[in-house]
Amino acid sequence: MDIPPLAGRTVAMSFCALPVSYLLNQVSAFSQPLFVVLTSALILGLLFLAVYSLSHGEITYDPLYAVFVIFSFTSVVDLVIALQEDGYMMGFMDFYTKEGEPYLRTAHGIFICYWDGTVHYLLYLTMAGAIRKRKRYRNLGLYWLGSFAMSILVFLPGNILGKYSSEMRPTFFLAILYMLVPCWAGVRIFNQSRAPTSYTPDMVQEEQKKSLLQRPADLALIVYLIFAALFTVFRGLVVLDCPTDACFIYIYQYEPYLRDPVAYPKLQMLMYLFYALPFYCLAAYALAFPGCSWLPDWALVFAGAIGQAQFSHMGASMHMRTPFTYRVPEDTWATFFLSNLLLALGPHLLAFRCLWRPAFFLHAALPSSPQDQDKKQQ
């Protein structure tokens, strides 16, 4: 997709986060958690009014435009937080990480901020530009939906269940409202019409007649999905304290981060066990049997979710904020990195396959009879 002309205006509004955060950081009143949450709500409200007044036509055409522009602002804030916590910036968001959301200072929180400040930010700019030019952005929206939902579903419960549960601030309840956004946005994105395809019914039937051996890419993906499902079950058993020797060796020698009391890694593995595992099985079925029209959409959602999850999990496992005893040992770093990288790349290859040649997943229409063709010609 080409870079839309609106990107410049959206970038300008989002980068207002830099002077705003710097000025707020200099005000001593923001050492109180209540002031932090009230100011955060006020800034978001003023930003919405500014977007509404400047881009009323775009919001009328698609209300998600306002969401993408506002979230591009928060993405810059998250990137500033991540860079500051890693020592690349100073004096911008100290007040927020101390009195707003201290759990953003964890390794997992830092990598969530990096993902939001880069991948999500680019998605917001592109989708806002697509709305401006009245173009489709359904595929990008589905990817963002999965990524955003996964980050929220792991991060918010992890804040409650982990060692930072005693440091909850009023800002946490403002973050809970974020859970409503993917629900509303997901309904709107799924209700958008799909991009038209050029496949005729005869082409669809011809593609769906092919056996699995005639589709080596699908066969390879099914093999991958089987191994990914087995690995997901294994890591789920590991975090559930399975007493077998294999689980004991794995959690101490390969992924000790799963024992970290911050609770994010354990919740991540449980999300995989209860949600990713069923998808692996259903996706393998959809690749073997034709006509599963749901797979292309959900493959995009799943790719976004796994991409965000694996980025945060892999980064936090090796970050300096993670205690040394919970970091990946140097002698098993290659095994850890390769296995988790494959787990992240596989869903993206599946989504690419579904978008590349979707005929296998379309509903096959019955071929028209000669009598019907004669009627059409008459």
UniProtKB/Swiss-Prot annotation:
Its main location: endoplasmic reticulum. The keyword Secreted does not apply. One of its GO terms (cellular component) is endoplasmic reticulum-Golgi intermediate compartment membrane. Highly expressed in the liver at both the mRNA and protein levels. One of its GO terms (biological process) is regulation of lipid metabolic process. The chain crosses the membrane at residues 10-30, 34-54, 63-83, 110-130, 140-160, 170-190, 219-239, 269-289, 291-311, 332-352. This is Transmembrane 6 superfamily member 2. It comes from Mus musculus.
